[in-house]
């Protein structure tokens, strides 16, 4: 998700250290201390404007959520949603998805969400896709044994690529939805992007996979 640069975004994040962890490397291995409890930790890589992570936190107060995005302006909009919702079980990080092992110990994260990641359609950009094998190496380290990834996209090419990447990595594809919104799946929390494009008739794909 690309958004216009937001004036004051950096200051906005800096002024809310309760929600925005400015030095996440210091939290490595002690995220339960950061949250002040021993509840499960779920992360969303590429959290966009925060609709999903906030919605999940409201729905599941017994789970700790961490929204991760590298874009400063985007993360500032996510912070707006977190502040408006007053959810106590959300933290936000401005870091790159390829560097997660710098901020989480092995097995410290209980579940991961990848929602509407950049498809990087050109073959020469394959290594930038968040479901490329090098990213899977990183995810496997920070997740527990048989850790889960829940992946959603509206891009058929990226979905097919990701299914193949998961399978080739040796992951188990537990459930697959080829048209999520036409299915009987309950409990879906939509991102802003998902809501916008599904209303235009765009098909949404989803898979749950574990290592």
From Swiss-Prot:
Question: For binding S-adenosyl-L-methionine, which residues are annotated in this chain's numbering?
Answer: 44, 69, 96, 118
Q: Which UniProt keywords apply?
A: Methyltransferase, S-adenosyl-L-methionine, Transferase, tRNA processing
List of catalytic residues:
118
* GO MF annotation terms: tRNA (guanine(46)-N7)-methyltransferase activity
Could you tell me which PROSITE patterns the record lists for this protein?
Answer: SAM_MT_TRMB (PS51625)
Where do the annotations place substrate binding?
A: 122, 154, 191-194
Q: Per its UniProt entry, what is the enzyme's top EC class, as one word?
A: transferase
- Signal peptide as annotated in the record: none
A single cellular component GO annotation: tRNA methyltransferase complex
Instruction: Spell out the reaction equation it catalyses.
Output: guanosine(46) in tRNA + S-adenosyl-L-methionine = N(7)-methylguanosine(46) in tRNA + S-adenosyl-L-homocysteine
Q: Which CDD domains does the entry mention?
A: AdoMet_MTases
Question: Any keyword Zinc-finger?
Answer: no
What is the E.C. number?
2.1.1.33
Pfam families registered for this protein in UniProt: Methyltransf_4
Q: In which pathway does it act?
A: tRNA modification; N(7)-methylguanine-tRNA biosynthesis
Q: Where in this protein does the record put region Interaction with RNA?
A: 124-129
Stored PANTHER family: 3-DEOXY-D-MANNO-OCTULOSONIC-ACID TRANSFERASE/TRNA GUANINE-N 7 - -METHYLTRANSFERASE (PTHR23417), PENTACOTRIPEPTIDE-REPEAT REGION OF PRORP DOMAIN-CONTAINING PROTEIN (PTHR23417:SF14)
Instruction: Give the protein's function.
Output: Catalyzes the formation of N(7)-methylguanine at position 46 (m7G46) in tRNA.
UniProt family annotation: Belongs to the class I-like SAM-binding methyltransferase superfamily. TrmB family.
Name recorded for this polypeptide: tRNA (guanine-N(7)-)-methyltransferase
- The gene for this chain is trmB
